[in-house]
Amino acid sequence: TKRKFSVNSSGKYEYIKIVYKGRSYKCLLDTGSTINMINENIFCLPIQNSRCEVLTSNGPITLNDLIMLPRNSIFKKTEPFYVHRFSNNYDMLIGRKLLKNAQSVINYKNDTVTLFDQTYKLITSESERNQNLYIQRTPESIASSDQESIKKLDFSQFRLDHLNQEETFKLKGLLNKFRNLEYKEGEKLTFTNTIKHVLNTTHNSPIYSKQYPLAQTHEIEVENQVQEMLNQGLIRESNSPYNSPTWVVPKKPDASGANKYRVVIDYRKLNEITIPDRYPIPNMDEILGKLGKCQYFTTIDLAKGFHQIEMDEESISKTAFSTKSGHYEYLRMPFGLRNAPATFQRCMNNILRPLLNKHCLVYLDDIIIFSTSLTEHLNSIQLVFTKLADANLKLQLDKCEFLKKEANFLGHIVTPDGIKPNPIKVKAIVSYPIPTKDKEIRAFLGLTGYYRKFIPNYADIAKPMTSCLKKRTKIDTQKLEYIEAFEKLKALIIRDPILQLPDFEKKFVLTTDASNLALGAVLSQNGHPISFISRTLNDHELNYSAIEKELLAIVWATKTFRHYLLGRQFLIASDHQPLRWLHNLKEPGAKLERWRVRLSEYQFKIDYIKGKENSVADALSRIKIEENHHSEATQHSAEEDNSNLIHLTEKPINYFKKQIIFIKSDKNKVEHSKIFGNSITTIQYDVMTLEKAKQILLDHFIHRNITIYIESDVDFEIVQRAHIEIVNTTYTKVIRSLFLLKNVGSYAEFKEIILQSHEKLLHPGIQKMTKLFKENHFFPNSQLLIQNIINECNICNLAKTEHRNTKMPLKITPNPEHCREKFVVDIYSSEGKHYISCIDIYSKFATLEQIKTKDWIECRNALMRIFNQLGKPKLLKADRDGAFSSLALKRWLEEEEVELQLNTAKNGVADVERLHKTINEKIRIINSSDDEEVKLSKIETILYTYNQKIKHDTTGQRPAQIFLYAGHPILDTQKIKEKKIEKINEDRREFNIDTNYRKGPLQKGKLENPFKPTKNVEQTDPDHYKITNRNRVTHYYKTQFKKQKKNNKLSISQAPGTR
């Protein structure tokens, strides 16, 4: 039978407004309809096929698409809705059957409707000329008809030519169920309600920038795109005091060759005051590294990704922009905001969290689905599509790649065997014209550098081009080396090198090597390479010793491959045999010690291989430059990336608030305790399995920051693997501590341990005692408590003497970075004449000024002449002669803003002393010659020859070449600012470096005492003495004091000291 569908003879329509997932919808109520209807693009839910004939005044129509609206806060059970654009003003139509099931009550007195025990306001609207619909429901369902499903989507634009008949048939049936996910150009774009973008700024003062002037053609384009965004509901008119200018950037021409443009908003000033969102963006290498052993890949393309996220209401006004026609603001998240990528990544992780790393991986709006079989892959696609549909997101299905054996993802081609460069970008490189300008060189190197991991010895090949980027360097495109470098890079990209994807079940091998000018490394498994890396050494690194360069290669390579190596046992292969004893070096030096500490977070073994067997890494580190290689441009590795791996720390777990301790035993038991305010969970287990580890993580990893201790590396690998698989289901940051100390329960027990150890070890001092205790025990504020206990020790107070510094401590002299930064002066005497000798440390430029006497006035006048000729230095270093030590000369130098630094007694400065030896040698040579004219101008001839004629051994240049054409540090204000900023850290670094040398054979004196005086002895009257020790006063009778003086060598004149 045919039933009339909802025609209101009064010409008025009754509807209610419901809120579902944060969005309001208009629901038309029709007691005469036996079905429910919903407009297209309201919800992205899987479509079922159920035919229904509808008769209208214009003729019959057929409805085929049915969605099942899931149970929610409004509808208490799943309800069917036919998909059809039945109205332009309403979103849904609720029929009689649903109204009856909901036990609806319409109260016209109060204009309310009760639906499922919830009351809504009844709204009446005027007629909108809807069609008069008559429906006839057919009982049969055709949901199982695959032939019907094939007709639902236009697959002519889909990329399915690579599929066989079975794959095509199954895929089309699956895609048709999710037809509502497809976005077509011109449709109204939906948005997700899982997240809103919030603009947190440092202040609320409006940011206003004037509109940029645009060409007339661009103004027309801007207005057209603004109108389109208004129609789609992406923007609205604004009254905001904020304003950011619009500009136009060109896009690729369309198929007809017509120019295309994109309107963008310049949010740079807004971004400057935006507080950065530290949500981690995944590392591309890390994502690509998880795609091994897969046979099928599907890449998903979200439609206008950022625009599918709603703006927070309070942040909308900050996105305001203006055009010639008006002032607008974004309702959806626009492109160009500082934190937009982080918000989008957070959104995608929240939506797909249960599927990440198991079925799919996400990088911003790029989603890749991976599986090992067809059935598994189709199931993975359905799971991902269901999550996206629940989040109300739209896809550009015609741009997606389905069931591919080779997928284009993040600029690479992912295959079951490995990763290959993208052929599209390879084609762009091949057709690239030879660069003739700096900007073109940088663009080309940026394009090829994107694939540098596939090119062994990239730094060597690109060197002739990178060297052209130096200042004042002419680009010679006819130069053979330049052309060869350019063509070779293109030829190497044309090749199809395939790198193996990492298998995290196997052991990694990191092979490194360093040459005089570059570093190289290769990461491999079972002899198959995973990635090649190389870079040149900078000017500072060129002066490193052989072992320093080899260790630098290891430090740099482990940092680059951190996400592969951290938390895993791996092997380092090097042809530098001394590195095998890296951990056993007693005095490695400050630089090696810092690098050794940096490598301590890794678990590795160093193996020696012969140089000829290390051909790959050796080739990567060889850079063949015939001359002037010291100042060549340097290629640097990428910054350290974020990682999902459990990080390691050498700090004992006892110092952390949330502790989880794994103990292997014959029991399976969990205990909770608390000590010193720290929460401790002790998990006893017999055998660790992956399933057990996952359950432990889900049950106990519930806090924001957790530190774990697990002794067995094998069991830790299992926990690590479990954490990687479920890391995106929690917000927990996990650190593994390598040490577990014994907690001392009470102060009495703590004091007993200290006193017993202190006596047993013959009364060590505070620092030694603290270190000994902390090796095996933990007690809060132990250092301060140990200090108090030892301060009260009578034996220490009476027996230990003072250690006074007798000489200045040895310090490493920092190298100057400019000419005129540091002068070294001394008094030089020869043949009855006296001179002030001066040498610039940076350039080795030397000069002498004659003086009549050695008093400070003559020295000042000589220094004035030197400063007039050479310029004033920042630092003047001199011996402790009477003239240089005079207070008058020091004050004059302070007025001239020159810092004076005096050497210790009997400790000459090597540079100027060597200059004196050279001058004496030259004088003896001149005196032995017969040239009388030269004898009359000995000093002038010697200085001219020294500065202008001879290259210095240290610099490799003539001193005058460096000194006369170098800049002046006083005028370089930016560097002065940078040095002031670094001053605090500089002092600390110098102190740390000095500690390695203060115990060495060159340190003749004792160290300066950083502590305050601790003991003072004075005679109060003829019969009594008073000893003050750390504010504790003890009185002695003279006979008792003399006895202690004899036994402990105390004296009244004794100065304060430490133990």
From Swiss-Prot:
This is Retrovirus-related Pol polyprotein from transposon 297. GO terms for biological process: DNA integration; proteolysis. One of its GO terms (cellular component) is DNA polymerase complex. SUPFAM superfamilies: Acid proteases (SSF50630), DNA/RNA polymerases (SSF56672), Ribonuclease H-like (SSF53098). The lineage of its organism: Eukaryota, Metazoa, Ecdysozoa, Arthropoda, Hexapoda. Residues 230-414 form the Reverse transcriptase domain. Residues 1027-1048 have a biased composition (Basic residues). CDD domains: RNase_HI_RT_Ty3, RT_LTR. Residues 812-967 form the Integrase catalytic domain.
